[in-house]
UniProtKB/Swiss-Prot annotation:
Entry's family note: Belongs to the G-protein coupled receptor 3 family. TAS1R subfamily.
Protein name: Taste receptor type 1 member 1
Domain of life of the source: Eukaryota
Sites where a glycan is attached: N87, N88, N95, N291, N479, N529
Entry annotated with the keyword Ribosomal protein: no
Pfam families in the cross-refs: 7tm_3, ANF_receptor, NCD3G
Keywords in alphabetical order: Cell membrane, G-protein coupled receptor, Glycoprotein, Membrane, Receptor, Sensory transduction, Signal, Taste, Transducer, Transmembrane, Transmembrane helix
Source species taxonomy: Eukaryota, Metazoa, Chordata, Craniata, Vertebrata
GO molecular function: G protein-coupled receptor activity; taste receptor activity
A GO cellular component entry from the record: plasma membrane
Length: 841
């Protein structure tokens, strides 16, 4: 507040000097003032293009040094029409007359001058600064205008300490909605915040992620470009090139040539131009001069429908122009009002006499010279802007209507302070020619944008409304069938740094922009989530994905199920073996006292058959989903059972060698072996050693059910962990040593009596056992699939079958098929024959 006060004190001196200067040498037009019960101010750019540099602290004389601005003229007339309609209305502000003071704000100095004029006390040449501004009554109650963001910010800052309502028809910058800085600012044009969001949605809709961005150097352009860059990059859009055109930019100068070169080199098909009309004209004249064609130009509302831009010679060759435009609205009767003004007899400008209250910028000689056939044409862009000025006047009138209590049909005529009117204007909500006029909490209008495309019919320009943008939130509605693209087959132009990757390919950024990338397929076991296109994510433990996948699939859980044909075959074979073992045990029990059974070991055969049955029973643990009991028992029980069988086989062969070869040669050893029950002791010790190995194995390297994920990317293997342990290896090495011992003993007994000579059968069974396990371990080294347990079971079944077949089947054959060989006489004859052979040698 102190800063504003200090500025106003300094400006008070300036305004006194300026008025003194103006009143000596200027004139004013009666069209700029209208007396009334309550006055409004209108700030309009009736002139523009004031290029001279001031060397003295003087206000620009718009009528003398600037060119006529047709657009500003239509705004000027829209306010005059609005006030006239309100004064003629019996419903709105009955028995109250509105007056106005209109100013030509062709330059910043003219704008400051006009603002200070409306802030001054009625009939005074100064602004009275006092501690309490609550009861300060300036010349006007409200201000309509000015046109640009820069000038609106200046005016709003000066009006803010006094809370004089200011309704701008053209200042769209988002910063003006900050009420801490501009508490009395309202507007009838949409906030640039929504324009920027609309542009981003437009870019996203057509997949344009690689764009160039150009703005003007005023607040409108710079703030708009900055906001658009922030929002666009936040939505994954990359800015290939960005530049701001200076106020001094001219067609063909080095600055614009450099800008054109960079635009061409950037390679972006889409260029967003967020600029004022004046610099947009310079820009597109440079584009035409450089022959920069084949692009899509996205226009901000300031120039999207401006004839000032469409009139650039050769602009129809530059490519496609899409734009965001203020929703097309017409001021009813404005054209007729302007025509009537052109036909009317104008009063001559009155001179400013010393001490009078007039201004050099309340004069428009061109306006007074208009005839019906020379008056400016009312075009779409000017009509939309004029409507914003028109409804700003009505918003003030409705606020004053409520403040004066006019709802009863008659208005009170008490003193009104600007801050009181500001509160009422913020609350207005009414229909104006079927258009709702109201303000949100930021005092922005409830409005919308049109999305337009330029059309050319030869040299004639027109535009097509493609859709609209509404808020909040911002939503874009476009009828794409109305768009005629300037490319092959009416296809949407592409504006990307890199084309989209194939499904399942991640983007690897090259350079500084995330829109520029290479496509690399996701590795096996990873997938590309659409939420992050730049990083392949790993699948879950129970999932898998092939290379280049955008989703994960559940892994297939595999194990040797009972329902499989392989399982049926193995199950039948193992069951058959068990039945044979059981049948053999019964057969041997029935013929226990026969020579064949006694020579096979007698009761020791039942231990051998039982151990084989235990090993066979353990094989059932390989079927179905692995469980803890199955994992604990299946390999250990098999190893222990086969150890007992091999121990019995070894000791049986060794015992025959002792009887027939060492009983006479080494009688002491023979008697010690028999008296100390060497056979049973050997079997017990050998089995105990294997039992110790197995117990250590089960305790230290406990076999447990496990889910294996590494071998196959798409499978989960259910297995036991026994084959990965040292205990498993030790147990099978121990059985290997026993097999070698049994083989050696059998080989040493190859020349025993025929009925006791089992070398051939035992050798065959042991060799088959070796081959079976060598085949299994070879298979396991190259194959890790679901049928590995089946291979393991087959090796075990082969070992058991070879042991049973090599040792017991020949004896079963003699018992069942050759009972003549199962006699004491036959065995005695065989022993006698062996004795004769040994004696002869």
């Amino acid at each position: 507040m102190l800063l504003c006060t200090a500025r106003l004190v300094g400006l008070q001196l300036l305004i006194s000097c300026c008025w003194a200067f103006a009143c000596h040498s200027t004139e004013s037009s009666p069209d700029f003032t209208l007396p009334g019960d309550y006055l409004l101010a209108g700030l309009f750019p009736l002139h523009s293009g004031c290029l001279q540099v001031r060397h003295r602290p003087e206000v620009t004389l718009c009528d003398r040094s600037c060119s006529f601005n047709e657009h500003g003229y239509h705004l000027f007339q829209a306010m005059r029409l609005g006030v006239e309609e309100i004064n003629n209305s019996t419903a709105l502000l009955p028995n109250i007359t509105l007056g106005y003071q209109l100013y030509d704000v062709c330059s910043d100095s003219a704008n400051v001058y006009a603002t200070l004029r409306v802030l001054s006390l009625p009939g005074q040449h100064h602004i009275e600064l006092q501690g309490d501004l609550l009861h300060y009554s300036p010349t006007v109650l409200a201000v309509i205008g000015p046109d640009s963001t820069n000038r609106a910010a200046t005016t709003a800052a000066l009006l803010s300490p006094f809370l004089v309502p200011m309704i701008s028809y053209a200042a769209s910058s988002e910063t003006l909605s900050v009420k801490r800085q501009y508490p009395s600012f309202l507007r009838t044009i949409p906030n640039d915040k929504y324009q920027v969001e609309t542009m981003v949605l437009l870019l996203q809709k057509f997949g344009w992620t690689w764009i160039s961005l150009v703005g003007s150097s005023d607040d409108y352009g710079q703030l708009g470009v900055q906001a658009l860059e922030n929002q666009a990059t936040g939505q994954g859009i990359c800015i290939a090139f960005k530049d701001i055109m200076p106020f001094s930019a001219q067609v063909g100068d080095e600055r614009m040539q450099c800008l054109m070169r960079h635009l061409a080199q950037a390679g972006a098909t889409v260029v967003v131009v967020f600029s004022s009309r004046q610099l947009a004209r310079v820009f597109f004249e440079s584009v035409v001069l450089t022959n920069l064609t084949g692009k899509v130009w996205v226009a901000s509302e300031a120039w999207a429908l401006s004839r000032h831009i469409t009139g650039v010679p050769g602009i129809q060759r530059i490519g496609m122009v899409l734009g965001v435009a203020i929703q097309k609205r017409a001021v009813p009767g404005l054209k007729a009002f302007e025509e009537a003004y052109a036909r009317a007899d104008k009063k001559a400008p009155r001179p400013c006499h010393k001490g009078s209250w007039c201004s050099s910028n309340q004069l428009c000689r061109e306006c007074q010279a208009f005839m019906a056939h020379t008056m400016p044409k009312l075009k779409a862009f000017s009509m939309s802007s004029a409507y914003n000025a028109y409804r700003a006047v009505y918003a003030v009138a409705h606020g004053l209507h409520q403040l004066l209590g006019c709802a009863s049909g008659a208005c009170s005529r008490g003193r009104v302070y600007p801050w009181q009117l500001l509160e009422q204007i913020h609350k207005v909500h009414f229909l104006l020619h079927k258009d709702t006029v109201a303000f949100n909490d930021n005092r922005d209008p409830l409005s919308s944008y049109n999305i337009i495309a330029w059309d050319w019919n030869g040299p004639k320009w027109t535009f097509t409304v493609l859709g609209s943008s509404t808020w909040s939130p911002v939503q874009l509605n476009i009828n794409e069938t109305k768009i005629q693209w300037h490319g092959k087959d009416n296809q949407v132009p592409k504006s990307v740094c890199s084309s989209d990757c194939l499904e399942g390919h991640q983007r690897v950024v090259t350079g500084f922009h995330h829109c520029c990338f290479e496509c690399v397929p996701c590795g096996a076991g990873t997938f590309l989530n659409k939420s992050d296109l730049y990083r392949c994510q790993p699948c879950g433990k129970e999932e898998w994905a092939p290379e280049g996948s955008q989703t994960c699939f559940p892994r297939t859980v595999v194990f040797l199920a009972l329902r499989e044909h392989t399982s049926w075959v193995l199950l039948a074979a193992n069951t058959l073996l068990l039945l044979l073992l059981l049948g053999t045990a019964g057969l041997f029990a029935w013929h226990l006292d026969t020579p064949v059974v006694r020579s096979a070991g007698g009761r020791l055969c039942f231990l051998m058959l039982g151990s084989l049955a235990a090993g066979s029973g353990s094989l059932y643990g390989f079927f179905g989903e692995p469980t803890r009991p199955a994992c604990l028992l299946r390999q250990a029980l098999f190893a222990l059972g086969f150890t007992i069988f091999l121990s019995c086989l070894t000791v049986r062969s060794f015992q025959l060698i002792i009887i027939f070869k060492f009983s006479t040669k080494v009688p002491t050893f023979y008697h010690a072996w028999v008296q100390n029950h060497g056979a049973g002791l050997f079997v017990m010790i050998s089995s105990a050693a294997q039992l110790l190995i197995c117990l250590t194995w089960l305790v230290v390297w406990t076999p447990l059910p496990a889910r294996e994920y590494q071998r196959f990317p798409h499978l989960v293997m259910l297995e036991c962990t026994e084959t990965n342990s040292l205990g498993f290896i030790l147990a099978f090495l121990y059985n290997g040593l026993l097999s070698i011992s049994a083989f050696a003993c059998s080989y040493l007994g190859k020349d025993l009596p025929e009925n006791y000579n089992e070398a051939k059968c035992v050798t065959f069974s042991l060799l088959f056992n070796f081959v079976s396990w060598i085949a299994f371990f070879t298979t396991a080294s190259v194959y890790d699939g679901k049928y590995l347990p089946a291979a393991n079971m087959m090796a075990g079944l082969s070992s058991l079958s070879s042991g049973f077949g090599g040792y017991f089947l020949p004896k079963c054959y003699v018992i069942l098929c050759r009972p003549d060989l199962n006699s004491t006489e036959h065995f005695q004859a065989s022993i006698q024959d062996y004795t004769r052979r040994c004696g002869s040698t």
